């Protein structure tokens, strides 16, 4: 029996949602570069769920449905207020809150196609409110209700900080959402598909995916990148800090990727937004330090930056707390998780691999008195 640790290189299913071929990422055949430069996140949601881009009426209908379903049940807000959430990592709070949503959804266990689409809308609509409500309540602030005249990216930033974001900020966050929406069969997406392949409900599948994303080997890299940038603090300290890390064979977060060999195609878009945002905010050092780190690392190792590296300075420049970086990943990836859940339901087969047994050989039971 041949064992492939971590299932690396194993093709476990067929999918029409996204592909990574020769370091090119596509959603339903559309190059990520094309989508990042031109598409709204709402268009990408529709694309992933319907395998085609929407027309104008379909896009407006989706936006209206997301806006109409964006408010949280009061029970979740009260839960955040009662629980000592200052001691909880936001991913733990997000996992619990999404699971709670299922308790208040009368269609949670209704499995027909139309009910699943309605649940998809509710989940995608409410996850920004969960993250922003958590963020504000732990600071002693009241949650801010979403505005129906704002788009998805604009509403998130508004609910987080209470200020109307600038066009540059909206563009940057929309681009980040588009870039993180799906990524083929990553760990959290595979987890969601394994869960719903048992014919469990959508809330269970998404909750399982969030649990997988919570692990530091999947989510959290951009949070670690920002921690590194804060430790370095100045452009003058970069060279000594990075060379010391590399000399001691320590890992530099935000570089390299399990799938991409020549480079993550998403990184350049966030690099550009990092430059624009840090200049606009009068804090160019975060971009300058990042580019210097990239120069030093790539001069010594064949490891180009991945999507996490420049997203750190982008999110920081948008006024987002560092421990919210991974929950924001979930806000975007919710669209991809749902797309894969819907696809799994459509052509389902229980996912049940085998394991190579490496324990002791056959043994005879010994009564406890004789042990």
Residue ranges and their predicted role:
Residues 1-371:
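Non-transmembrane, aqueous-exposed alpha-helical and coiled segments at domain scale
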């Amino acid at each position: 029996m041949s064992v492939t640790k971590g299932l690396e290189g194993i093709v476990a299913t067929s999918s029409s949602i996204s592909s990574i071929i020769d370091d090119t990422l596509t959603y339903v055949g559309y190059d990520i570069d094309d989508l990042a430069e031109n598409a709204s996140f709402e268009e990408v949601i529709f694309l992933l769920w319907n395998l085609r881009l929407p027309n104008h009426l379909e896009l407006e209908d989706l936006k209206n449905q997301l806006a109409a379903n964006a408010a949280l049940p009061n029970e979740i807000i009260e839960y955040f207020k009662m629980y000592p959430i200052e001691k909880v990592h936001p991913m733990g709070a997000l996992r619990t809150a999404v699971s709670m949503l299922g308790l208040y959804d009368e269609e949670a266990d209704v499995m027909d196609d139309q009910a699943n689409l309605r649940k998809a809308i509710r989940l995608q609509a409410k996850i920004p409110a969960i993250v922003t409500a958590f963020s504000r309540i732990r600071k002693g602030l009241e949650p801010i209700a979403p505005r129906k005249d704002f788009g998805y990216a604009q509403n998130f930033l508004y609910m987080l900080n209470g200020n109307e974001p600038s066009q540059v900020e909206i563009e940057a966050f929309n681009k980040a959402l588009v870039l993180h929406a799906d990524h083929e069969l990553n760990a959290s997406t595979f987890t969601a598909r394994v869960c719903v392949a048992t014919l469990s409900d959508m809330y269970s599948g998404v909750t399982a995916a969030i649990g997988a994303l919570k692990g530091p080997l999947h989510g959290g890299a951009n949070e670690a990148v920002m921690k590194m940038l804060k430790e370095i603090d100045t452009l003058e300290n970069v060279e000594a800090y990075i060379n010391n890390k590399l000399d001691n064979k320590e890992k530099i977060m935000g570089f390299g990727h399990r799938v991409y060999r020549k480079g993550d195609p998403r990184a350049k878009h966030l690099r550009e937004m990092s430059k624009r945002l840090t200049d606009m905010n009068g804090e160019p050092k975060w971009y300058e330090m990042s580019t210097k780190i990239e120069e030093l690392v790539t001069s010594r190792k064949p490891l180009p930056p991945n999507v996490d590296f420049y997203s750190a300075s982008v999110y920081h420049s948008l006024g987002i707390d560092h421990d919210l970086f991974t929950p924001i990943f979930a806000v975007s990836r919710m669209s991809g998780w749902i797309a894969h859940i819907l696809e799994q339901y459509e052509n389902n087969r229980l996912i049940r691999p085998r394991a190579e047994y490496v324990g002791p050989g056959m043994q005879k039971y010994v009564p406890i008195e004789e042990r």
